[in-house]
Amino acid sequence: STTSSQDKQLRFTIQLVLYDTDLPDNMFFHPTTGNPTRGTKPLIQDLPSEQRRFMRLAKNATVAEVIEAGIEAFQLPDAVVDGGDDVEDRTRFSRPRCKYVLHIQSASHNEQPLHPASKVLAAYDTLPLLQFVDTDVKRKSLDFTVAPGVMDDILSTDPLFVLRIARDKYKQEGVV
């Protein structure tokens, strides 16, 4: 339909943050690369406490899609969307899986969780900068719901999105 193809052409950028407190057990941000690293933390005082990514989303992107893209962008091993499709969990049930949720912080609201099926755009108090993507440009990233974004696309009224580890009884399946 014309509407859904137009929705995929309209994009906006979010700022997504991951704090070191939301890394799986025995992981830390590498002091040089910033990537999550498994093992014993080095005895360095200046380990990064957070990492940020800018993601350009299709207008109709869901919270679950952002969580999946965040897991990939931050290179989190064995991580899945909390409340997402359990088919993959059943096929790989022998491995512990960290489940992640998405929270939002804005000037008008304290941090609060977002439902995985909800649209990201619905979380905004004020609409973000919506940009049409030139469909004549033959780039693979146009086919995806999520693509890399840039800081310049973030407005001062835009909220901060936070990737959080699910903090409940099934935080990590298979881990006692």
Residue ranges and their predicted role:
Residues 1-176:
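Intrinsically disordered, Pro/Ser/Thr-rich cytosolic linker and juxtamembrane tail regions that serve as
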